[in-house]
Amino acid sequence: MSYASEVKKELTGITVHEKNARAELMALIRMNGSIGLANHAMILNVQTESPAIARRIYSLIKQLYKVESDILVRKKMKLKKNNTYVVRLRHHVQEILGDLAILDGFQIKERVPLDLLTDDLMIRSYLRGAFLAGGSVNNPETSRYHLEIYSLYEEHNEMIAEMINRYDLNARTTNRRSGYIVYLKEAEKIANFLQLIGATTSMLEFENIRIVRDMRNSVNRLVNCENANMDKVANAANRQVENIMLIEATVGLSSLPEKLRAIAETRLAHQEVSLKELGTLVPGGPISKSGVNHRLRKLNAYADELRQGKAI
């Protein structure tokens, strides 16, 4: 099961009171519902690919209106796609859609009733229904954090974004496949949205995975940085040894001033140690790291002069 499916499964298990159940059902029907005729009577079909969401729609209708509906299963044969589930309401359709402020003549309204936007719990419930109807969220294991809600109607999409942004979540909108989406890209905002709509367990899982992933990335960066520093130190030490050996072969280390000769001989004897360790090994030491570095730079410069024939 995908992470998005786990989130939706958790949401379908939330117990809601009548007012909030109404707001959630309002979103589910507005986004996934269609009106038809059967035997000269109006029917409502609400379609989903999730059996859990189909059961949720069925339960909400029964809870609010004490009306039974049918759940139909349509099998998709092509490409082994998921089945489609249709919750079909045959009785009291106009009354129920009127109560939900969804029906406009024989069409579903795009706008959400303004009185809904004044109640915090109803907004959260509506957003939960909207996510169940058209939402998806990337697995936090991936490097691309993304949560979106798809809607057929531009005005409805803008209103969903407005609801989300009441909670400072920086939701944005764009066009998508003959429809519209509202989306979140920031991990912290996605986690806050999941908590907002009631997916607390999924939010905690999201945060745990994200924290572990971020820590792993930080460790990798530190290791890479440490490896780069070690390579840099090793390359510098190799260059120092090569230059000291050149000096020894050309003019002999005995020709060097005492302090330079001491550091040169110590470096040849301890080629892999750091500058700090080298300073503790020099006869007559210890010498500070900066002091060791200063003397080695002098040896490097002297070796370069020997290569150019300037110091002989």
UniProtKB/Swiss-Prot annotation:
Organism: Limosilactobacillus fermentum (strain NBRC 3956 / LMG 18251)
Entry annotated with the keyword Cell cycle: yes
The name this protein goes by in its record: Probable cell division protein WhiA
GO annotation (BP), single: cell division
Function: Involved in cell division and chromosome segregation.
Residues in the DNA-binding region annotation: 274-308
Domain of life: Bacteria
Family from the record: Belongs to the WhiA family.
DNA-binding found in the keyword field: yes
Matches recorded under HAMAP family: HTH_type_WhiA
UniProt-recorded Gene Ontology molecular function terms: DNA binding
Transmembrane segments: none
Keyword entries, A-Z: Cell cycle, Cell division, DNA-binding
